[in-house]
């Protein structure tokens, strides 16, 4: 997070508030829309945790102070008009008071573009189950059993992918590949490998390498 941000550049409304969009820094998922004033922004920068201003209670509040669902701030940006801020966070639990991961869990409209975020969203959910286990949840069960159980499942799913491909059954293959990808994401979380790490490796292999070959 940039500590040298100048709050004076921000355009607060007549009540001294500015809308703050909170976004997961890894998955890109929008978690909530809240409001900040100069004091809450200052406390956010000083503590590396999100602080907002409650319009209803007319006081500052720290996300996770009661629930434990803290948000560690990675970056704060402001838009071209300086009248809204974007807060990138590492969320330690659900953002919504309902228990949902994001406050934006009701869809007004959706098209295929939304599918682009499904893998980061699944990865974020897996991370949440790892850091905050839920009794009876399959993902939490895998983490509880450890790496040997996860590797066993990956081996089983890989075998089922091979069988589905040999059977030339597209629907079955799609299903088995989805299972393999899910368990691979679980292993990544267990081993501390992020989607960003994978993207960087693929970039080195397919973009940088291609550029070097052209030189």
Swiss-Prot record:
Subcellular location: Cytoplasm
A single MF term (Gene Ontology): phosphoribosyl-AMP cyclohydrolase activity
UniProt cross-references to Pfam families, sorted A to Z: PRA-CH, PRA-PH
Chain residue ranges for the region called Phosphoribosyl-AMP cyclohydrolase: 1-118
Disulfide topology: none
GO biological-process terms attached to the record: L-histidine biosynthetic process
Annotated region (Phosphoribosyl-ATP pyrophosphohydrolase), positions in chain: 119-215
Catalytic activity entry: 1-(5-phospho-beta-D-ribosyl)-ATP + H2O = 1-(5-phospho-beta-D-ribosyl)-5'-AMP + diphosphate + H(+); 1-(5-phospho-beta-D-ribosyl)-5'-AMP + H2O = 1-(5-phospho-beta-D-ribosyl)-5-[(5-phospho-beta-D-ribosylamino)methylideneamino]imidazole-4-carboxamide
Keyword tags: Amino-acid biosynthesis, ATP-binding, Cytoplasm, Histidine biosynthesis, Hydrolase, Multifunctional enzyme, Nucleotide-binding
Classification via NCBIfam families: histidine_hisI, PRK00051.1, PRK02759.1
Protein name, as recorded: Histidine biosynthesis bifunctional protein HisIE
Native species: Oceanobacillus iheyensis (strain DSM 14371 / CIP 107618 / JCM 11309 / KCTC 3954 / HTE831)
Lineage: Bacteria, Bacillati, Bacillota, Bacilli, Bacillales
Gene: hisI
């Amino acid at each position: 997070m940039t500590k040298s941000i100048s709050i004076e550049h921000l355009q607060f409304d007549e009540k001294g508030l500015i809308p703050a969009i909170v976004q997961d820094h890894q998955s890109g998922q929008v978690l909530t829309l809240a409001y900040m004033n100069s004091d809450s922004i200052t406390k956010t920068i000083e503590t590396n945790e999100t602080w907002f201003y409650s319009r209803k209670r007319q006081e500052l509040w720290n996300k996770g102070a009661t629930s434990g669902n803290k948000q560690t701030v990675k970056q704060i940006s402001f838009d071209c008009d300086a009248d809204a801020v974007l807060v990138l966070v590492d969320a330690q639990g659900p953002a919504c008071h309902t228990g949902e991961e994001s406050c934006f869990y009701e869809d007004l409209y959706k098209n295929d573009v939304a599918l682009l975020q499904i893998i980061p969203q699944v990865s974020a959910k897996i991370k949440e189950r790892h850091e905050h286990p839920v009794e009876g949840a399959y993902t939490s069960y895998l983490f509880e059993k450890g790496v040997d159980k996860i590797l066993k499942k990956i081996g089983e799913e890989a075998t089922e992918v091979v069988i589905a491909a040999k059977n030339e059954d597209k629907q079955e293959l799609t299903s088995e590949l989805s299972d393999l990808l899910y368990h691979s994401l679980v292993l990544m979380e267990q081993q501390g490998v992020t989607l960003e790490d994978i993207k960087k490796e693929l970039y080195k292999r397919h973009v940088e390498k291609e550029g070097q070959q052209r030189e």
